[in-house]
Amino acid sequence: MLIIEDKELKDRVEILRKEIKNRNLNGIIIYSDEYRSGYCTYFTGYKPINVIEESPQTLIVMENEDPILVIGRLNYYSARETVWIKNILQHHKFDTEISTMLKKFNKKGSKIGIAGEHLMPFYLRDLFTKAMPDVNFPIVTEILDDMRKIKSPQEIFLMEKAAEINDKVLTELKSIIKIGMTEQQVVAHADFLGRQMGADLGSATVVMSGKNTKFPAWRATDKKINKGELVMVDFNPAIGYYCNDGGLTFLMPGASKYKSDALKNSHKIIKKTINSIRSQTKATNVHDSFYDLLKPLSLEPNFSPYVTGTRGTGHGVGLDVVEFPDLNKFSNFIFYPNMTFAIKLDLHDLEGEGLRVEQVVQITEEGVKPLNKLALNNSDDWAIL
């Protein structure tokens, strides 16, 4: 089935309880919002929809207590019937009955961890402090990051399905994109095709053309695609809430040899780099491979200034399109089997434009298993129209 079964969700909570005990915590409060739902969806199997409300999730797991899920009032009704957790409350009651309920956990010397603190609004943190003034609240988001970074067989199965749809959509777009179309029209085709194939959208579809490709992200406009321009498509379908982040750049007819060569070389380089990834090696090897392959081609200046920050060469992928760990020039953590990453090569200032080739892979004992296969299985000039 295209979901995570309740048994796996419950097992995750039990693993979490053991980690809480190992850290001498009395409980944990996990927060996520509807745009980055992964921290709570990982345990609940529910992803809120943003209808006419903001609908975060808050999961409260205290020692020797059943878990409590707090969710927005409109999502509450479907969550109550579909989520395995029995104690489900409404978010707008946080400052009344939920705060009153939390007071029983207010004990001197108690420690209740907070996860997802970078998403949690100040007013909610203040409510916890007011309800439990004698409790210490250490930040323990790394517990969840460590759990989520290693994927289960079912998680990878869902991610494979999402990747297959991404590859199919980008393949269809190759014959659809034409000079004179707008960025918004390309988004419309991508989103329609993805949904027609059964996918949800993990995040907004990014389509940028020409001068707009200089940005790391861009909301599609009515700008028309012109002759010889690079057209970047970053499409993120999701199956069972598990995302794919495969992106390609198309080159319109009439382009310069310089841009054509840069795009062909980017495909060649990402193939070599992905095939070189090994378990038990440092993540910085991704950057180093890109650098070593770009330098002889005089493309290193189009790469190096842009890879020191967040997501410079990729990132983890799963319930969220972008999740821990981050890949950049300084990411010296170790690759382990069943971690999943978007491996991303961005080149900038190519006659004032930029390109991206991004493919999601699973780390294995032997090396990598590509989940996206489009850029890896086709010729280096495949995206040149």
Q: What do the PLM-derived regions correspond to, one by one?
A:
Residues 1-385:
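Active-site neighborhoods and metal-handling regions in enzymes and metal-associated proteins
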